[in-house]
Regions:
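Conserved small/polar residues in nucleotide/adenosyl-binding loops
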Residues: 1
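Anionic-ligand anchoring segments at beta-strand to alpha-helix junctions in alpha/beta enzyme folds, i.e.
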Residues: 7-12, 19
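Hydrophobic alpha-helical bundle architecture
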Residues: 15-79, 91-95
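Extended hydrophobic packing segments that form well-structured cores
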Residues: 47-49, 54, 66-68, 89, ...
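A structural signal for small-residue-enriched, beta-sheet-centric alpha/beta enzyme cores
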Residues: 81-88
Protein backbone atom coordinates (compact mmCIF):
# COMPACT_ATOMS: atom_id res chain seq x y z
CA UNK A 1 0.00 0.00 0.00
CA UNK A 2 2.80 2.43 0.86
CA UNK A 3 4.27 2.15 -2.67
CA UNK A 4 0.95 3.27 -4.16
CA UNK A 5 0.00 5.93 -1.63
CA UNK A 6 0.02 9.49 -2.87
CA UNK A 7 0.20 11.47 0.36
CA UNK A 8 -1.00 9.83 3.56
CA UNK A 9 1.43 8.28 6.01
CA UNK A 10 -0.97 7.95 8.96
CA UNK A 11 -0.78 4.76 10.99
CA UNK A 12 -3.56 2.25 10.28
CA UNK A 13 -5.32 1.81 13.64
CA UNK A 14 -7.83 -0.90 12.78
CA UNK A 15 -9.39 -3.16 10.15
CA UNK A 16 -13.13 -3.78 10.31
CA UNK A 17 -15.74 -5.95 8.67
CA UNK A 18 -18.61 -4.30 6.82
CA UNK A 19 -20.91 -2.52 9.30
CA UNK A 20 -18.83 -3.50 12.34
CA UNK A 21 -18.82 -0.86 15.09
CA UNK A 22 -15.63 1.23 14.92
CA UNK A 23 -13.83 1.26 18.27
CA UNK A 24 -10.52 2.88 17.30
CA UNK A 25 -9.83 6.56 16.72
CA UNK A 26 -7.98 7.83 13.67
CA UNK A 27 -7.35 6.06 10.38
CA UNK A 28 -9.18 2.73 10.03
CA UNK A 29 -10.11 0.47 7.10
CA UNK A 30 -13.45 -1.25 6.50
CA UNK A 31 -13.99 -4.05 3.97
CA UNK A 32 -16.77 -2.82 1.68
CA UNK A 33 -17.86 -2.85 -1.97
CA UNK A 34 -16.82 -0.15 -4.44
CA UNK A 35 -20.43 0.86 -5.04
CA UNK A 36 -20.84 4.26 -3.34
CA UNK A 37 -24.25 3.79 -1.64
CA UNK A 38 -23.41 0.32 -0.29
CA UNK A 39 -19.95 1.37 0.90
CA UNK A 40 -21.20 4.47 2.73
CA UNK A 41 -24.14 2.54 4.22
CA UNK A 42 -21.56 0.27 5.90
CA UNK A 43 -19.67 3.29 7.21
CA UNK A 44 -22.89 4.72 8.66
CA UNK A 45 -23.74 1.35 10.25
CA UNK A 46 -20.24 1.38 11.80
CA UNK A 47 -20.94 4.69 13.49
CA UNK A 48 -19.73 7.27 10.98
CA UNK A 49 -21.71 10.48 11.39
CA UNK A 50 -20.16 12.59 8.59
CA UNK A 51 -18.72 11.41 5.27
CA UNK A 52 -15.80 12.98 3.36
CA UNK A 53 -16.28 11.46 -0.09
CA UNK A 54 -13.67 11.90 -2.84
CA UNK A 55 -14.61 11.57 -6.50
CA UNK A 56 -12.71 11.92 -9.74
CA UNK A 57 -15.54 11.04 -12.08
CA UNK A 58 -18.31 13.05 -10.50
CA UNK A 59 -20.38 10.80 -8.30
CA UNK A 60 -23.36 12.86 -7.14
CA UNK A 61 -23.85 10.60 -4.12
CA UNK A 62 -25.71 12.07 -1.16
CA UNK A 63 -26.74 10.62 2.17
CA UNK A 64 -29.56 11.46 4.56
CA UNK A 65 -28.51 9.47 7.65
CA UNK A 66 -25.07 11.16 7.66
CA UNK A 67 -24.09 14.31 5.73
CA UNK A 68 -21.73 13.62 2.84
CA UNK A 69 -19.31 16.28 1.61
CA UNK A 70 -18.13 15.58 -1.92
CA UNK A 71 -14.50 16.39 -2.68
CA UNK A 72 -13.72 16.81 -6.39
CA UNK A 73 -10.25 15.55 -7.28
CA UNK A 74 -9.96 17.68 -10.43
CA UNK A 75 -10.96 21.22 -11.33
CA UNK A 76 -12.49 20.37 -14.72
CA UNK A 77 -15.04 18.03 -13.16
CA UNK A 78 -15.65 20.48 -10.29
CA UNK A 79 -16.50 23.24 -12.80
CA UNK A 80 -18.96 20.97 -14.63
CA UNK A 81 -20.57 19.72 -11.42
CA UNK A 82 -20.30 22.80 -9.20
CA UNK A 83 -23.85 22.34 -7.86
CA UNK A 84 -23.00 18.81 -6.65
CA UNK A 85 -19.42 19.20 -5.34
CA UNK A 86 -18.57 20.76 -1.97
CA UNK A 87 -14.78 21.17 -2.31
CA UNK A 88 -12.41 21.41 -5.28
CA UNK A 89 -9.20 19.58 -4.35
CA UNK A 90 -8.12 19.86 -8.00
CA UNK A 91 -6.77 23.34 -7.19
CA UNK A 92 -3.67 21.58 -5.84
CA UNK A 93 -2.69 21.02 -9.47
CA UNK A 94 -4.67 23.63 -11.41
CA UNK A 95 -3.86 26.59 -9.13
CA UNK A 96 -0.76 25.28 -7.34
CA UNK A 97 -2.49 25.37 -3.93
CA UNK A 98 -0.77 23.44 -1.16
CA UNK A 99 -2.08 20.14 0.14
CA UNK A 100 -2.04 21.71 3.60
CA UNK A 101 -4.26 24.62 2.48
CA UNK A 102 -6.79 22.36 0.76
CA UNK A 103 -6.71 20.00 3.75
CA UNK A 104 -7.50 22.91 6.06
CA UNK A 105 -10.42 23.88 3.79
CA UNK A 106 -11.77 20.33 3.99
CA UNK A 107 -11.30 20.27 7.77
CA UNK A 108 -13.10 23.61 8.19
CA UNK A 109 -15.96 22.46 5.97
CA UNK A 110 -16.29 19.27 8.04
CA UNK A 111 -16.53 21.40 11.20
CA UNK A 112 -19.14 23.66 9.59
CA UNK A 113 -21.23 20.71 8.39
CA UNK A 114 -20.97 19.06 11.82
CA UNK A 115 -22.19 22.37 13.29
CA UNK A 116 -25.32 22.45 11.14
CA UNK A 117 -24.40 23.85 7.73
CA UNK A 118 -25.81 21.87 4.79
CA UNK A 119 -23.86 19.94 2.15
CA UNK A 120 -24.66 20.52 -1.52
CA UNK A 121 -26.58 17.21 -1.64
CA UNK A 122 -28.58 18.17 1.47
CA UNK A 123 -29.45 21.54 -0.07
CA UNK A 124 -30.74 19.72 -3.16
CA UNK A 125 -32.68 17.19 -1.09
CA UNK A 126 -30.65 14.21 -2.35
CA UNK A 127 -29.99 11.02 -0.42
CA UNK A 128 -33.44 9.51 0.19
CA UNK A 129 -32.62 6.38 -1.81
CA UNK A 130 -28.90 6.00 -1.09
CA UNK A 131 -29.16 3.69 1.93
CA UNK A 132 -28.15 0.34 0.39
CA UNK A 133 -26.94 -2.46 2.71
CA UNK A 134 -24.33 -4.73 1.11
CA UNK A 135 -25.79 -8.03 -0.05
CA UNK A 136 -23.75 -11.15 -0.76
CA UNK A 137 -22.98 -11.24 -4.48
CA UNK A 138 -22.76 -8.56 -7.15
CA UNK A 139 -23.93 -5.07 -6.20
CA UNK A 140 -25.06 -2.77 -9.01
Amino acid sequence: IRDRSKACTAKLNGVYKYGEIIKEKGFVFMDSPGYDPASVTGQIASGCNIIAFTTGRGSAFGSKPSPCIKIASNSKMFAKMYEDMDINAGVILSENKSIKEVGENIYNLLLNIASGDKTKSEIQGLGDFEFVPWQIGAVM
